[in-house]
Amino acid sequence: GLGGGVKVAKTAEEFDGYANSILDMNLVTKQTGPGGKRVKKLLIEQGLNIAKELYLSILPDRATAKMIVMASEAGGMSIEDVAEKTPEKIIKVYVDPNVGIQGYHLRAAAFGLNMPKATMKPFTVLLKNLYNLAVNYDCSLVEINPLIITAENDVIALDGKMDFDDNALYRHPDVQGYRDLDEEDPTEVEAGGHGLNYIHLGEGGNVG
């Protein structure tokens, strides 16, 4: 990983070394900000024979009042860097939420990613389920990076991220059960306990 938080271990000794170096480290990424976050947990995954890495996300676009399926063949790297340096590598498919995702949306995304024929069905099933998840759970972002194609033509989400609209969480008590308060701003957590929304404006922030 770009911040040093992802390692490939091929032996038990390598695993022990990486685990000891990552736990308690201060991980700095674009998501954490310059202050970083202390690593308290490790996620261990099986290694796979990766043939291709893709990027896939779904998010609302307030300017058009539509949902955007955003995808790129430049998976496994920062999508912000891709957008800045090679925006032509990002494809966008706009979906009217009143109609929902249709076959032509799924095909547009699949063809835009140059999906092999053998992966078309599993990819379109995954994308449709991902869209429904984003809409049904009031997500402000659902992201898979990377979405991989293996040498055996399996389509697998290696890493995923979901952002929920805090103002809609009351409709999803099941989601609240997954909250990790250690990863949230303590001041925001305390304010939320009193039914308040707290927004930190930074050291020099002001209103009015």
Regions found by a protein language model. Give the residues of each.
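ATP-dependent carboxylate/acyl-activation modules
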Residues: 1-144, 148-208
